[in-house]
Amino acid sequence: MPEYLLLPAGLISLSLAIAAGLYLLTARGYQSSDSVANAYDQWTEDGILEYYWGDHIHLGHYGDPPVAKDFIQSKIDFVHAMAQWGGLDTLPPGTTVLDVGCGIGGSSRILAKDYGFNVTGITISPQQVKRATELTPPDVTAKFAVDDAMALSFPDGSFDVVWSVEAGPHMPDKAVFAKELLRVVKPGGILVVADWNQRDDRQVPLNFWEKPVMRQLLDQWSHPAFASIEGFAENLEATGLVEGQVTTADWTVPTLPAWLDTIWQGIIRPQGWLQYGIRGFIKSVREVPTILLMRLAFGVGLCRFGMFKAVRKNATQA
């Protein structure tokens, strides 16, 4: 290498090493439900996530095969696609729904406004409850509360439908989570879940490079563990509360474009950098490696986007 390039190359290498070190040292690893609440409180308070993602802190649905789509519209389309897949579009107005892991209420408001459901959204984050309430007009039949999905405060059989999107990775015990979800569904009611899942490592163990990738996907966003699609379906059926079998589907293909689309939003909407200043810019850029790792993991089959539907067994069948 020419001598005049040694200093710039050295500075670039040093900068990359420092950035990588800071990325690893500032990971938001799961410690307890409080660490999850704190992470979402911070994301909600700073407003950056809402600025770029809108009301919906979940992936979008781009069709199968995927087509180019407005980023926010893809998230709205996801809610309708999930409602249709779960059979919720055939239910009457007034149906009671519990939205577990409701974020700032995007899905809850659609289910209330477009389907006429009476929705209760719960999240572990007080700031998300505050923001969801602020965003919900008085005439929309959706309300929000702080609650722990590992120990829901509702009596058995409280809701016609329980709905949950991308909350499962934050749950330390998937069997307990599965039982709590089904416990609060009325007999004959519906549970519909969408989640990030990992490949079933009982069938194909993680290899030498997949293990550190998975470690970062867990540690960076306060996830104790990912279930596999097969494993969580087994968790649901093991409760003894499911009529027949759990229905599953793999929505990796229609949701995959959302990862790179997330990064693209920051490029085509740079005004957000000005609105939130240098601190907001750094916080946004800091998430890019994790988003790219997510795209890699879902793209090569290390992770999958799982869909689950179960009908609660009637009391006479229990």
From Swiss-Prot:
Disulfide bonds: none
MF terms in GO: 2-methyl-6-geranylgeranyl-1,4-benzoquinol methyltransferase activity; 2-methyl-6-phytyl-1,4-benzoquinone methyltransferase activity; 2-methyl-6-solanyl-1,4-benzoquinone methyltransferase activity; methyltransferase activity
Keywords recorded for this protein, A-Z: Methyltransferase, S-adenosyl-L-methionine, Signal, Transferase
Residue ranges, annotated region (SAM motif III): 184-193
Residues spanning the signal sequence: 1-39
Gene3D superfamilies registered for this protein in UniProt: Vaccinia Virus protein VP39
Stretch list, region SAM motif I: 97-106
Residue ranges of the region described as SAM motif II: 157-165
Reactions listed under catalytic activity: 2-methyl-6-phytyl-1,4-benzene-1,4-diol + S-adenosyl-L-methionine = 2,3-dimethyl-6-phytylbenzene-1,4-diol + S-adenosyl-L-homocysteine + H(+); 2-methyl-6-(all-trans-nonaprenyl)benzene-1,4-diol + S-adenosyl-L-methionine = plastoquinol-9 + S-adenosyl-L-homocysteine + H(+); 6-geranylgeranyl-2-methylbenzene-1,4-diol + S-adenosyl-L-methionine = 6-geranylgeranyl-2,3-dimethylbenzene-1,4-diol + S-adenosyl-L-homocysteine + H(+)
Involved pathway(s): Cofactor biosynthesis; tocopherol biosynthesis
EC number: 2.1.1.295
Top-level taxon in the UniProt lineage: Bacteria
GO BP terms: methylation; vitamin E biosynthetic process
CDD domains: AdoMet_MTases
Family: Belongs to the class I-like SAM-binding methyltransferase superfamily. gTMT family.
Function description: Involved in a key methylation step in both tocopherol (vitamin E) and plastoquinone synthesis. Catalyzes the conversion of 2-methyl-6-phytyl-1,4-hydroquinol (MPBQ) to 2,3-dimethyl-6-phytyl-1,4-hydroquinol (DMPQ, a substrate for tocopherol cyclase), and 2-methyl-6-solanyl-1,4-benzoquinol (MSBQ) to plastoquinol.
Protein name: 2-methyl-6-phytyl-1,4-hydroquinone methyltransferase
Species the sequence originates in: Synechocystis sp. (strain ATCC 27184 / PCC 6803 / Kazusa)
